[in-house]
Amino acid sequence: MDKFYNYNSSLHQVLLNLKVKPNSKQNLISNFVIINNIPYLKLSIKATPEKGKANEEIINYLAKAWKLSRSNIEIIKGHTHSVKTILIKNINEDYLNFIINSYIR
């Protein structure tokens, strides 16, 4: 299986595939799902998908959970869809692997 992220070591950034479920009971990352042979990290978000609320909560949640600056996290694809691509800048590959491995069982 392919990874649900693509790390660029020269730029210290990662493209991360997310499958987001808005209107959830809690904000939670839980394992992964495969859609059209592409793996995605599953993310449940409490916010509604209206006027960018869910997208804003995704950035806030990831920044807080992973101890990253909000300015280093950007949704680059899927602004109005539940399948999203996230760009995270200024992240060390070892730290990224530590984060990812904490969700994969």
Swiss-Prot record:
Q: What SUPFAM superfamilies does UniProt report for this protein, alphabetically?
A: YggU-like
Superkingdom field:
Bacteria
Q: Which GO terms describe its cellular component?
A: cytoplasm
Pfam families cross-referenced by the UniProt entry: DUF167
Q: From the record, what ranges are coiled-coil?
A: none
Q: Which PANTHER family match?
A: UPF0235 PROTEIN C15ORF40
Entry's family note: Belongs to the UPF0235 family.
**Protein name per Swiss-Prot or TrEMBL:** UPF0235 protein A1C_06510
